[in-house]
Amino acid sequence: MSEFNIAGIQQIGVGTIDFRKSWNWFIGYFGADIKILEDDTVAERMLPYTGGKPQQRHACIAVNLQGGGGFEIWQYSKRKPSVCPFKIAVGDLGIFAAKLKCSDVAAFYKKVSATWKSCTPPEKLPDGTPCFYMNDLYGNCFQLVEDKSIFINEDKLTGGMVGAVIGVTDMDRSVKFYSEVLGYSVIKCDTVCRFSEHNLMPESDKQYRRVILAAQKRKGAFAELFGDSTIELVQALERKPRKIYEGRYWGDPGFIQICFDVSNMKALGKFCAQKGHPFTVDSCPD
């Protein structure tokens, strides 16, 4: 195999201070009730992002069979997790919200808002997609986006991960990266507007450049499960954004990574290097 293939978003990592409470919450509200794996071992490969030494962690990957990527729920086992010292605001640098699949935004909002108050009324994304925002029990923000596709119908209103909302400093360079390297080459919208009609997340009423990117139909063994996904890039125009993970480790509370399902990682590594984005960590260098 000389070419690489990206089949979709396999999972998005969520660092937490309490593994079991987070997972139970994701099961109860988002239906992430199928365990793919769970272990409590040492993370040895991410040394540039874990203080230069291996770190013990308890993690699992859980999915919702309605379709979409999974949750990688991740907690340090022997190190006290370092929470973000400031309240994360719209446009801060890194993943500040995860996109979650929802077959009926209005119906799910009605259901969930009866028991969970940290959510906004439905609105629309700049590309016209119905959505609403919801914080989990530790303040991680999820953007519920309407997507009526179903992998296995379990009569749930939610599915899995279908993208991320990412704060950036240089929109044009970021669009080029996600388009050329990760295949998000379809620009669904490129606009300047406020982020939300509501203020679940600080600075939602400020002006931002927002670009929503989609990919052509993905192929691969699990592409049908993962489904379509989008990347929403957000650049602050009226404030200086902060780095969400400055002074902290990978695995600390928050959204820690987007994991793509890749065939032929060596070919992808070569391609990334040619594009000026060499791997910073390679779990299988040989």
Describe the predicted segments one by one.
Residues M1-N5, Q11-V14, K35-T41, R45-M46, ...:
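Vicinal oxygen chelate
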Residues S22-I27, V112, G139, S174-S179, ...:
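Conserved active-site tyrosine of GNAT-family acetyltransferases
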Residues G52, P81-F86, V90-D92, S103:
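Post-signal peptide N-terminal segment of secreted/secretory-pathway proteins
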Residues L93-A97, M161-V162, P253-I256:
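Eukaryotic phosphotyrosine signaling hubs
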Residues V165-S174:
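Repeat-solenoid scaffold signature
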Residues Y184-V186:
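Phosphate-binding active sites in nucleotide-utilizing proteins
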Residues S204-D205, I212-L213, A223-W250:
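Flexible internal linker/loop segments at domain or repeat junctions
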Residues E238, G251-F260:
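Low-complexity, glycine/alanine/valine/leucine- and proline-rich hydrophobic stretches
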